[in-house]
Every structure is written in C-alpha cells, then in structure tokens.
C-alpha cells in the first residue's frame, strides 16, 4: 500500500462548487473511474464505468466519476446523463491525477478514507480492473461485478494522463523557428516507430508539425539494400506549417543504403548522423558503394557528419541487463531517438512512459529500450557536439485539446461521428488493401460506438455487403485503393441505379495495376468521375490534410444520406499515413444529419387504396427510403431501369432518357459552399488545387505573395458537383495553373467545363509536391 498526499487536492463538483478531495471521502473509501473527455479511449469505457460503479452503489463505498482536464460544462457534455445517477467531480488541472501518479486514462482507482490507495488500474486492462473490483468487493463484503462483460471493448493502453508536456528550453540550446529531420534505415530498423515517437514528443511539447512516412512495399526487403530503405520525415515548428518540409536539415542514416538513397534530399550544409557500425564491406556493397564514404570520397563534402557507433554502444549498455546481443541490436533505434531528442531539446518523459506502456510485461525489452534511449541522450550531452543543440518553442496554436492524428484515423473517427450525427449505425464492408487497411484496423475497435465491420473475401463482396447494409438502413461504407475501385465499379453502378446512400473511400496510390502500393499519387479522379458503364454520375469529395479527413467523412455521409446516392471520398497514401496536430472539435458544434424513412403509403392506386412507390422524390430528388420489413411498404429495387415513381421495370425510351437526366440533376442539387480565395484577392494567377496538394500550394502561394506576386489559391473539396462560383473565379484570372499528382486530370475537366486555358503542373513520382517546387512554378508563370 502506498500513501499519496491527495487529501488536500482541490477538485470541483459537476455543479461547479470547489471542494477538497479528502472531504469527499467521508467515512467510506472512494471508488473512481477517471476519464479524459477529449479522447475516444475514455469514451469507449463509459458504459463499462457506469456498470461497475452502479454495481457498488449501496455498498459501504462512495463511487464517483472524475473528469480530468475539463471544466464542469465540458464534463457534463461528455458524460451525458451519467452525473444524474453517479457522483461526478472535475479535476480541471489534473492535480488529483498527478497525486495518484496515474500515467494513462481511463483509470480505475480505489482510495481509502485516510488517503491510502487500495489500487489503480490504468488504461483498459480487463484483468486489472477485475482484480481491483474483486478486492473492493471483498473489502466491502459486496458481490463482485462482471468484468469484463460481453459488450465491453477489447483491452487497450489508454492515453497520457497528464495532457501536454511543458517544454524546458535548455540554456545551451540555440532557439530556431523550425527544423526538418529525416530518419532512414532498413525496414526492420524501426524508423517509423522512431519518427512517430519523436513526433509525439514534439506534439506534447506544443509544436506544430507535419510528417511524411515512406516505406517499401515489401514486408521485409533484403536487409541493407536500397529497396528496403524505410524513412520518416518530420518538420516541427514554432509557427503554423502545412508540409513536412522542402528538404531535411538532418538525416539520421542507420546504414549505408539509407545514406545512399536519402543523402541527395538533404540541404547543403546539413547534418548527417550515421550508425558507423553498419558501414562494413558487405553492407557497402549492397548499397552500391565501392568505398566507405565515411573514410574516403567526396559524397559527404559540405555536410556536418556525426559518426556514432550506435550498435556497439547499445549492446554495451544492455550487456549488464541480461539482454542478448542480437536482441540489444533491435534497440539501436532508441539510441538514435535519444540522441536526436537531446539535440532538439525534446521532453524525454513521453518516450520513457510510452516504452513502459507499450512493452508492459516484457521487462527485458523495456529495460533495453530505456537503456538505449537514455544512452543516446547521454551521448549527446557528453560527445561535445558543439553548437548542435537547438530548441523550438511551442507554436501559438488556438486554445483547446490537441492530438496528433493520421488521415486514416481521422477518417475513421469522422465516419463514427457521422454515424452518431445521423443516428444510423455504421457498417464497414472491406477487403484489406494498402494504404486503406488502417481504416479497418481503427474501426474494428469501435464496436461499442455502433460500428460493425466485415472483412470480405474480395473487393466485390466488400462493396456488395456495404450496399446491402445501406438497403437495411445502415450508413454503408467500403474502403479501398485504385485497383479495388476498378473491381467495385459494377456494384457502384448498381448503387447509382438503386439510389441508396453508400460511401466508397479511395485511398489513392501509384498505379497502374499493383503499381506503387506504399507510395502516394492522386490519379483516380477520372476513374471516380467516369469509371462506370452508362451514365452513372455520383458526388465526389476529397480531403486536403490528415485532420480534414474527419470533416470530409462527415460531409460524404451528409451527401449520401441526404441525397440517397453513393459518394466517392478521395484521399491518398500521403494523407493516410502522415500526421499533424488536430484540435479536437466540440461534438455539440457538429451539425446533425437528418434522415427520414418512409413509414406510410405515399400514393393512391386507381382503386383508392394506399400504395408505396419507392421512387417518389423530395425537393432534392432523393427517393423515399423504406427499411425492409416496414409494414405495408414492401417494394422492389434492382439494376434494371425503373419507372420513376412506381419503381416498376421499364424499357420505355422516354422514361430512360428522363431517368438519366434525373440522376444527373440529383447530383447537381448537392449543396456545395462557395470557394474562398486564399492569398491575393486581386490575383493575376489563380492556383486551383485538390486533395493533398493543399499544404504545398498554400506554402508556395504565401511565399510568392510575400514577395509581391499577385497569386490566389482555391482548393476544391467538392469535385462533383463543382462549387457554383468556380467559373466566376476562373474568369477573373489572367492565368490559371492546376498542380496535381497525376498527368492533369482536374485540368482536363476544368478546360472542358469552363473553356479556360488551365496549365497543368504535374508530379507522379510517388512523393508529394514541395512548397519550393511550386513556388518556382508560380514565379516562372507570372514572369513569363
């Protein structure tokens, strides 16, 4: 039993009154579930917390919910009706969390009357929660609750309990505005993990950031080869940024192949940190070197080179821990992370806490990773690296709670939000395909939020199941990438004919065929627009940033449900895997999506009897949606052309022409907000973008405008139909350019639709545009 000084911690009641925690104990111990209202991890456990705490009401124990990091109003909004039946406190400044030494939320804690702690279960570990609940039941002579219950979520680790980490600026560090770092090594060297943890520490320190993960398509390419290089680039800044940077200032190269493949990306005069232990003859040959560039040759001329024996130093610090040399070798990425964390004054606590949580139960792994990280940090302190230590202040971001989020995760959460906003349960029918699979991995965790997931045997079965779910009243979704869209095209045409709400998420990648599974591209626009036989129009929306995927998912659902139509949502591999800070929205500000089902007859037959016609329409031309099993509303739908209104099969030429026009008009009735111009309002050059080009375009336009160029920028979220004012904005420009990660697909559509001489700027290399590339294009276009 450990005693904490928690009796004098000030907390708030849900009504707003302040009190001391000790006063709330009275003569009984306190059983608490502590929650963070700004994380899904805490929301997942609400029903479980309600069940466990309610079970102990009536026993000789007080039960309470504690909401950390929020005010009473926010806590009440998060908890809904729970405070009406369970005592609720607010730990706004997380002082109680700190005194309890809680590292992750949600947590289940029991505190005795004297302030001593019976136990704390952190995260959602059903076994730990059950053990603590059993101990409480034994102490109070009460029955034991069911933990876990059948509808409880699967185990998960929770989120950091302390919120953001205060960044300490070392006195010996030079303040800089931003830095771009690239970690590169074998696909088995843990570069994605290393970059992710550096990103996480930077997010907690309050920096703005943008990332670019790059990895090979092979599960494990031959070690030491150029084909097997995995890289992670991150830009961190003390101000708003929109891209992972033009060129890294620091390259961490874990082997010769990483140096060979990525050195050309580094800025002139940049810093190269190499694991010199890997620069031996065999690895040099695999990378295509005829010599050791660390000892001879001119490849590294003009760069600051820091040679570190990472492998040997890692093995040395792990030797006394009982870790085998081969196992210690796996921790060398943490040595690199520790060194770079020292160089850029990153807080160390988030990484050490994460190691403890991630590898819980694997004591040797924890010990090795912690030792390697701390050794790397110590190496930076003692190696006399001169002026290499810098610091970046926190960015002045709008107030609120932030999380670092990837596009696939944001899209998943947006679909869940849309499900709740529309009161329609979410069904995902999908077949795994890179880079869309993470959406399935995320949604499968959210059963308690009304999410149903189905992994089909192929792409056609996946979309068929989603369309069937839509027929049954669900928000039907299927996810895929380019090859999968081609396979789904016939069923997508069926969805157009059936006029049912369906969302098809296309996370684009390099093509054609298998193409570049792990590299980004945006070459499916024409496929989305026209890739079905017959006249089969449908709305198309696209996301511009990782966090924008959340909003676009809700918008796709709004269009699909309101207009009874399939919708294609376009993202790409860059958005899917890159991350940025995201200000968590207030759920109460998200607009509801109103869905009405047909429940009664909507027509009268010639005998005066009520009948249901499935193709009767509202002002949006959306047909009536009757759920299967609704009394007296039995009806027939299918892929053969239907008569408008009755839904009867029709081969009449006039009816077919009418239905073709009607389906097109129905898409045009989608309400699309007007475009707003970024940059110069009296522009001579207008840049029209879509998708993930937003960040690079915004950065380039900002640079050009700063130097006096009259450049405007509009970015299309809605690609079909277009915003009403697009034509007007195009007509005001002397010149128009359209940057795309394809060979000019949007440019072709704009030229055909508006008869504008739109110049296409293309890049199809598997990597996104940089702001520097586009800045040069803007200046050349206006100077021409």
Region locations from a protein language model:
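Conserved redox-active cysteine motifs that mediate thiol-disulfide chemistry
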Residues: 34-48
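Flexible, low-complexity linker and terminal segments
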Residues: 397, 404-414, 422, 552, ...
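Thiamine diphosphate
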Residues: 178-267, 413, 418, 426-427, ...
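Active-site cofactor/cluster-binding pocket
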Residues: 169-422
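Non-globular targeting/processing and membrane-anchoring segments
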Residues: 1-29, 44, 54, 58-67, ...
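Short, internal strand/loop/helix patches
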Residues: 79-105, 109, 556
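A short, hydrophobic beta-strand/beta-hairpin element that forms part of a small beta-sheet core
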Residues: 106-122
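Conserved thiamine diphosphate
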Residues: 245, 251, 300-303, 307-314, ...
